[in-house]
Each structure stands twice: as C-alpha cells, then as structure tokens.
Design a protein with these regions (language model features):
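Bacterial N-terminal signal peptides
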Residues: 4-14
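Cyclophilin-like peptidyl-prolyl cis-trans isomerases
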Residues: 18-255, 265-267, 278-286, 292-295, ...
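Glycine-centered tight beta-turn/hairpin loop motif at sheet-sheet or coil-to-beta transitions
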Residues: 32-38, 325-329, 350-356, 376-380, ...
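Short beta-strand elements bearing conserved aromatic residues within extracellular beta-rich modules
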Residues: 258-260, 299
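Tryptophan-anchored aromatic micro-motifs
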Residues: 307-330, 397-402
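N-terminal glycine/threonine-rich, aromatic-flanked beta-hairpin/loop signature
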Residues: 323-367
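Beta-sheet ligand-binding and adhesion/scaffold domains
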Residues: 373-421
Length: 421
C-alpha cells in the first residue's frame, strides 16, 4: 500500500517579480513592507546561496515548514505579520561600540519558534557586520543568559530568524550570524533606524516581495541549493504478524529525523518516537513503527532531512575535545563510555581527571546540544556543537560553550571541536 502522509498545507503563490534595470544594478532584492515604511535589502545570493535560498522560500511560501504556533505543516509566507519582537538601541562609550539591531522572523513574533529545521552557517570574508546588514540568527531555544536573550544558539542553528543592524559595527557577530543581505539606500536605512529606535513590538511586517534584475539573478534557483526538507514521508506501510514497518521510497540517510506516533481512535496518541539516522550506520530503508500489529491503528509520521548532516545519534565510545579561543583559553576533553552518558573529563585548568555525573545529548540537523556536569568542573556546562566536516578519524567543527551561575547561564567561550568517530 503506497502512502503519503496528508497534512493541511496552505499553498502560497510565488510573489517573485522581475523589474526593469535600475541604477542599483543587477541583483536579487527583498522588499520588506512595514508600518514604518519599506526596506529594500540587497541579497547576497552569490556569497551566501543557501542562506538566501532559505530566506526566499520562507518569504514566498514555496517550501514546507512547521508552523511553530500549530505544529502543522504549512507553506504560508513566514514573515507576513511578524513583528520586530526585540530591539537594542544602546549608545556605546569609547572603546565600546554602539549596539543597534532588531530581530524578527521567528514565526511567533517572540524569541521561540522557527521553521522546524536548521540550515548550516555560511560565512564570507567580505561580509562583515559593518552597518545596515541583514543576517540569519538562530533562535534561542535555551533559557536566557546573564546578558539577556541569546541572539544565536551557536554554530549551524540558522532557521528563520533574521537580524537587521543599524549604523554600527558589530564585530562580535562576524562569522557567528550568517550575513545574507545589506541595506544600501538612504530611505531604507532610515526605516531600519525608525524600527530600532521605535522599540520592541512597534513594527510589523505586512509582506515581503522578491525582485530580480539581470540574467544571473533570474538564473539563481533557490530550490537547487540542497536545503533541508520537512514533510510527509513517502513509502509503503508493511503489516506483518507481529510488527508494523514503514518502508521508505528513499532510504533514510545521515541527517534524517523520522518522527511518528500511534493512535487507535485518532483521539489519543502515543508519545512521539523520534528516529535519528547515525552517519556511522549507513542508511535505514525501513523503520519499525510497532512491535505488535493491533486490529486497528493510525500512524502520524513526519520526515525531516538535513542533507550532509554529520551529527551522530549517540556519544558512546567517542572522545570530544572543546578548545576555547582567546582570551579565555581552556581545553575540555570528554571521554565517553559505552553508554554514551558517562565517562571521564580532563579540564586544562585542573590537571586532575573528573567523572561525568550527568549528561544530556540531543542530535540536531547539523550539530547537537550537550549539557554536562563533571566532578572536576566547577559549574554545569552546556554547549552547542556544530559539525562542519570530517576526516578519517574525527568530526570537525565549532562550539559555543556556557556555564551555569545560578540563576543564569553565562558565556565561557567558543572555538574549535573534534569528536572521534
């Protein structure tokens, strides 16, 4: 029996337009229409193609996402109706720079939400936060820090939230947030300033349109950038005497998450089971849904694919090394046992080895979240791990590390990581 899980999907027509040549030259432009005026953003589709493609498909509603308000699949344009829920307008005193930015695009007009998937970071040496930039900054699903809500959860956590910066240089966001556009014309910059100085919750986006000028812009295909997929799985339900399986048309590979729940009456549902495909174990052509074939059962299934994702399903028998960059240079080495929830710790500030006393690890699209306590480290730690590449022995990437100082989490540092295979 060939099945495709049916979900309510609102299909939005494309609002891409082609405009005549202008003095601004060729390019792809996003027009944000707000109650304070219109902002034109020049999109950096050649330097950040994946980030631009993700933004365009969310703005136009041409790709599936999860509505964070309902938990259902939708193709409704995400940014329509969104408010700038957080703004910062702090004037600096030498040598500290002023900080001007505004956040929007969570899908909830708050600090939680997102599209239901992650997109890897894209950085280019020529794209710096030197004023009036637009960048993708992942939502803070963690609790707030000592310094307020987090702007970015860490490496490879981009989703839908975007940050507009004002007339300021914010180097601390360079190679942290993925810049994908800039605001160049004076009228649009004035609108950005009005949003930032108007305060949180005072500006709403009514709609976003995408315009293209020139052949290169017309040729850019946002659907050919190997973006994540979220939606119904395709395959065949196979019922045996003592089990129920779902045979996938395309075997699940690294970076895939298959979630399902079961009901006998469509009223009460079992807890959701989430299967993550570990890169070390190849592909999964079939997923077992139930151990015993009941007389009647309904299954609600959702598939999320993150192409090229390297996150392992478990830390069992692996070694994780976190190095923090100056000025707070520390090396943490975690040697995990066969359970993946225990092991030993070496902490460069304290030469003695410690024992892991608690651990929580959640694999995500292009990284993972880790929370850990150890007998020789003075505070609980939590880290966002981003996996960028691999060699024969290790996964290689970046991390953002925090320590818990009751009642807040505060940054310790960021830097490079390796995780043994």
């Amino acid at each position: 029996m060939k099945v495709s899980l049916c979900s309510l999907i609102l299909i939005a027509g494309s609002i891409t337009a082609v405009r005549a040549e202008t003095s601004e030259g060729d390019g792809i432009f996003a027009q944000f229409v707000t109650n304070k005026g219109t902002i034109e953003v020049v999109l950096e589709y050649e330097k950040a193609p994946k980030t631009v493609a993700n933004f365009i498909t969310l703005a136009e509603g041409t790709r599936n996402r999860i509505d964070p308000n309902t938990g259902r699949l939708t193709r409704a344009p995400l940014y329509n109706g969104q408010t700038f829920y957080s703004v910062v307008n702090e004037f600096g005193f030498f040598p500290l720079p002023s900080t001007f930015y505004a956040l929007t695009g969570s899908g909830t007009s708050s600090s939680v939400g997102g599209p239901g998937y992650a997109v890897p970071d894209e950085f280019d040496a020529s794209l710096r936060h030197n004023g009036y930039n637009v960048s993708m900054s992942a939502l803070a699903n963690f609790t707030g820090t000592l310094f307020g809500p987090e702007i970015n959860r860490g490496p490879n956590t981009n989703g839908s939230q975007i940050m507009f910066t004002g007339n300021t240089i914010l180097t601390r966001f360079d190679d942290v947030n993925s810049i994908f556009g800039s605001v160049t014309d004076p009228a649009s910059r004035a609108v950005v300033d009005a949003i930032i100085f108007g305060g949180a919750g005072t500006t709403t986006i009514s709609n976003v349109t995408i315009e293209r000028v020139g052949q290169a812009a017309l040729d850019f295909d946002e659907h050919a950038q190997n973006l994540p997929y979220v939606g119904p799985p395709l395959g065949e339900l196979r019922v045996e005497e003592n089990a129920v399986h779902f045979d996938h048309d395309e075997p699940l590979g690294s970076g895939s998450f298959f979630s399902f729940r079961r009901s006998s009456d469509l009223l009460s549902w079992s807890p959701t089971t989430r299967r993550h495909i570990d890169p070390d174990f190849g592909t999964e052509p079939s997923t077992q849904l139930d151990e015993i074939a009941a007389p009647k059962a309904f299954f609600d299934m959702l598939l999320t694919r993150h192409p090229g994702g390297l996150s392992p399903a478990t830390l069992a028998n692996r070694t994780l090394v976190l190095n923090t960059a100056p000025p707070n240079v520390i090396t943490y080495t975690f040697v995990f046992d066969s359970t993946g929830t225990g092991g030993t710790t070496n902490y460069s500030v304290d030469a003695s080895d410690g024992v892991i006393t608690s651990l929580s690890y959640v694999a995500e699209g292009y990284g993972a979240s880790l929370q850990i306590t150890s007998s020789n480290i003075p505070t609980p730690l939590r880290a966002r791990l981003g996996f960028d590449s691999e060699d024969a022995s290790n996964l290689i990437g970046r991390h953002f590390l925090e320590g818990f100082n009751d009642p807040f989490w505060s940054p310790i540092g960021s830097g490079q990581l390796t995780l043994s295979k």
